[in-house]
Regions:
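A beta-strand-loop signature enriched in Asp, Gly, Thr, and Trp
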Residues: 274-325
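Loop-to-transmembrane alpha-helix initiation sites
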Residues: 154, 175-180, 298-306, 328-330, ...
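Hydrophobic, membrane-inserted alpha-helices
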Residues: 113-118, 133-142, 157-164, 254-262, ...
């Protein structure tokens, strides 16, 4: 690493003002700050709250995503071999290797397109490159079906980065979660590629691994089966472990629980927001079940679909979620409740977490405003007394 540090110091003058490559200063600073702590200090007094800066936050979230990512890769291979009837004779390496080769291109496209736009935008605006897309670049591939074409994913990443992030001012200024923006773009632009029973299992062999399935092969998700009024073919145990069709990173409750522990232990995610999402979903599910409006049990709403993934990774986004302590409770509860409302009231769209987080992001500033104004009014009355 010292050799790399010395090399960067050697070429750095070329990218500084007056250097031959000054036009690419933002790109160089982006790579340098990604590898090392930036060589800058505050010129005036600074208030340091803790040692966690934005780069460390992003790094911890990326680490927390690894269990869901790795299990998602394995499950992609698992579903392919299971559909072909060759799961019993396949080795772990074959199953995971197929899933790895199927998911890797989506990760590469997400990062190449998203970071490419971020680099170009920083060059155009003469700004520093931010680390925010390091997390979004993994989340976006994890919340789409495995059969999503790469060109659709590229369009979604471009739309999300430009219209959900950069036009608001970049990292820390966006009001909508970038991954939610990408998912909504895909769902409303290409609904047939994001729903139904033909998009959840990879159907083509890759470099000799996996199986080529018939074009007419279908595999519905358990949540989709429940929405159609039939019992899911997968057991509750398989649903919790994650051996079910679904979006790449959303199937395993156990993997997501490990992710949640990491985020809560590091203090990056708020337990108030995360817990309130689950509370809102459970309360609303119990209400609908008591009224006889749905046969789906409350725990099925939690373990199926993208509820857990959305509650852990997307609802807790510190930029787009509510920031006041009381507001976090209302914000999370609203998201959980809306997710179940959409699932029950709209059978044609069994997954409601995406819209729930979108509306939660929309109302987060209003929630914070109401909480702050309530505190001001209460203190004013106390002062008068």
């Amino acid at each position: 690493m010292s050799a790399l540090r010395n090399y960067l110091n050697k070429i750095k003058p070329n990218f500084q003002k007056g250097g031959k490559l000054h036009a690419f200063e933002s790109v160089f600073d982006g790579f340098e700050s990604f590898l090392y702590v930036p060589n800058t200090t505050a010129k005036s007094g600074a208030s340091i709250h803790d040692s966690i800066d934005s780069k460390r936050i992003m790094s911890f979230v990326v680490i927390a995503l690894i269990p869901a990512l790795l299990f998602g890769m394995y499950n992609v291979g698992y579903q392919n071999f299971k559909a072909a009837g060759t799961l019993d004779t396949a080795s772990f390496i074959e199953v995971f290797g197929f899933g790895f080769l199927a998911v890797l291109p989506k990760l590469l496209v997400s990062y190449i397109v998203g970071l490419g736009i971020e680099f170009a935008w920083a060059q155009w605006k003469h700004e520093e490159i931010q680390e925010g897309y390091l997390v979004s670049g993994i989340i976006i591939p994890l919340i789409i079906p495995i059969s999503t074409p790469l060109w659709m994913l590229a369009l979604a990443c471009a739309f999300a980065v430009i219209f959900c992030k950069e036009i608001f001012g970049g990292t820390g200024m966006n009001i909508f979660n970038v991954a939610v923006g990408a998912r909504m773009f895909l769902f409303f632009s290409y609904p047939l590629a994001m729903s139904g029973d033909k998009v959840w299992v990879a159907k083509d062999a890759i470099f000799g691994l996996g199986n080529t399935l018939p074009d007419g092969f279908t595999a519905a998700t358990p949540l989709g089966q429940l929405a159609q009024g039939s019992m899911p073919s997968a057991s509750l145990c398989d649903s919790i472990i994650g051996f079910i069709p679904g979006c790449i990173g959303e199937t395993s409750v156990i993997a997501i629980a490990i992710d949640a522990i990491i985020l809560l232990w590091t203090g990056i995610a708020s337990w108030k927001t995360m817990g309130s999402v689950f509370a809102g979903g459970i309360v609303m599910a119990l209400i609908f079940q008591a009224l006889g409006m749905t046969p789906i049990a409350w725990y099925e709403h939690i373990v199926l679909g993208g509820f857990c993934f959305g509650a852990v990774f997307m609802a807790t986004d510190p930029v787009t979620s509510a920031r006041t302590e009381k507001g976090k409770y209302f914000y999370g509860f609203i998201i959980g409740a809306i997710a179940v409302i959409v699932r029950v009231m709209n059978p044609g769209y069994p997954e409601g977490m995406m819209l729930a987080i979108f509306f939660g992001n929309m109302f987060a500033p209003l929630i914070d405003y109401c909480v702050v104004q309530s505190n001001i009014s209460r203190r004013a009355k106390r002062a008068i007394k």
